[in-house]
C-alpha cells in the first residue's frame, strides 16, 4: 500500500525540487511532462519539452498513448498499450509519478494523465501544483534535450468505473442517474463561441452544468483550496454526495472536474471520454443544446 504522501493529488514545486535533490530509498520518482495543446495554437509540445523541462522528466504524449483506431481524439488506450508506454517512460509498480505541463494556465492537460494512471490502477500519482509556470516562477533548475529514462516493468488493468461512454450519457438523459459537469469555456458550452475543431459546432449535452476548468485555478495558476472548490460546486448546485460525471471537448480538461472533486474527498468521478466531439457527431439534433446553430442534420 502506497504511503499517504504518494496518494496526494497535488505536490508543490518545492516538494519536487527537494525530492530530486534527495531521492528516497524504495520510492522511485518519475516526472512526466504531459503538455498538449489544441492544434490551432500552433505549439509543438515535444519540441518545447526538448528546449526546457524539469530535470529527470520524460515526455508523455497524450495523442500517442491513445486508441489510434478510434475516430475521436486521444481516447483511452487499451491496458497493454498503456502499460508498455508507461514502462518505456520509466514508470514501474513502485514509482511515484508526478505530472505537470507547460501551459500558460499552470495546469491544463496534466490532469488527464493523472486520471489515466488512476484508471489503469496506479494510484501513486500526483500533479505538480502550478505546473512548469510555477516552477519557473520559483527559479528552480531546468534541463534540455531528449530524455532517456531507464525502462521499467509496468502492469495496467483498466477500472471501467473511471469511464463513461456515449451510451451511458444517452441513457442518463432519461434516467438522470448522475450529474454531468462540462468544463469547457462558457461560450462554447452555450453555443455562442466556436469550437476549436472543424466540423464541430458548439453547444452542450441536455441537463449538463458548466464549470469552466479555469475556475478551479487561481490567478497564479495554482489549484484553488478544497473550500473554494466546494463552494464552486455548490454555486452550480452540484451535489458532491451524489454521482457525478465530467465532460469537455475531448476528455482533457474534464479531468480538472475529477481533480477538484478528488480534493473535496470525492475520488470517484468518471470521465465521458468521447466528450463533446463524440456527442456532437453521434447525437440527434434535438440533443444538441445551443444558442447558436446547433446541429441541423
UniProtKB/Swiss-Prot annotation:
Substrate binds at residue 188. The modification N6-succinyllysine is found at residues 40, 146, 164. Residues 145-160 are annotated as: Hinge. SUPFAM superfamilies: Rhodanese/Cell cycle control phosphatase. GO terms for molecular function: 3-mercaptopyruvate sulfurtransferase activity; identical protein binding; thiosulfate-cyanide sulfurtransferase activity. By oxidative stress, and thioredoxin. Under oxidative stress conditions, the catalytic cysteine site is converted to a sulfenate which inhibits the MPST enzyme activity. Reduced thioredoxin cleaves an intersubunit disulfide bond to turn on the redox switch and reactivate the enzyme. This is 3-mercaptopyruvate sulfurtransferase.
Amino acid at each position: 500500500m502506497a504511503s499517504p504522501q504518494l496518494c496526494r493529488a497535488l505536490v508543490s514545486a518545492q516538494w519536487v525540487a527537494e525530492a530530486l535533490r534527495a531521492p528516497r530509498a524504495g520510492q522511485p520518482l518519475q516526472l512526466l511532462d504531459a503538455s498538449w495543446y489544441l492544434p490551432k495554437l500552433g505549439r509543438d509540445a515535444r519540441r518545447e519539452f526538448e528546449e526546457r523541462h524539469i530535470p529527470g522528466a520524460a515526455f508523455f504524449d497524450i495523442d500517442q498513448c491513445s486508441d489510434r483506431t478510434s475516430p475521436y481524439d486521444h481516447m483511452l488506450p487499451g491496458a497493454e498499450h498503456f502499460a508498455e508506454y508507461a514502462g518505456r517512460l520509466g514508470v514501474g509498480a513502485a514509482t511515484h509519478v508526478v505530472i505537470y505541463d507547460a501551459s500558460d494556465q499552470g495546469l491544463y492537460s496534466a490532469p488527464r494523465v493523472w486520471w489515466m494512471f488512476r484508471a489503469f490502477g496506479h494510484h501513486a500519482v500526483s500533479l505538480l501544483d502550478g505546473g512548469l509556470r510555477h516552477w519557473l516562477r520559483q527559479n528552480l533548475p531546468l534541463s534540455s534535450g531528449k530524455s532517456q529514462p531507464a525502462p521499467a516493468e509496468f502492469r495496467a488493468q483498466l477500472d471501467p468505473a473511471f469511464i463513461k461512454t456515449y451510451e451511458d450519457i444517452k441513457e442518463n438523459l432519461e434516467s438522470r442517474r448522475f450529474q454531468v459537469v462540462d468544463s469547457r469555456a462558457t461560450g462554447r458550452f452555450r453555443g455562442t463561441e466556436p469550437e476549436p475543431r472543424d466540423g464541430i459546432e458548439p453547444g452542450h449535452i441536455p441537463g449538463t452544468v458548466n464549470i469552466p476548468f479555469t475556475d478551479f485555478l487561481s490567478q497564479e495558476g495554482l489549484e484553488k483550496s478544497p473550500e473554494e472548490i466546494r463552494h464552486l460546486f455548490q454555486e452550480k448546485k452540484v451535489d458532491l454526495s451524489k454521482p457525478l460525471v465530467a465532460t469537455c471537448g475531448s476528455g482533457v480538461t474534464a479531468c480538472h472536474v475529477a481533480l477538484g472533486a478528488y480534493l473535496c474527498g470525492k475520488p470517484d468521478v468518471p470521465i465521458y471520454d468521447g466528450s463533446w466531439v463524440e456527442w456532437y457527431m453521434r447525437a440527434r439534433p434535438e440533443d444538441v443544446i445551443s444558442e447558436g446553430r446547433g446541429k441541423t442534420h
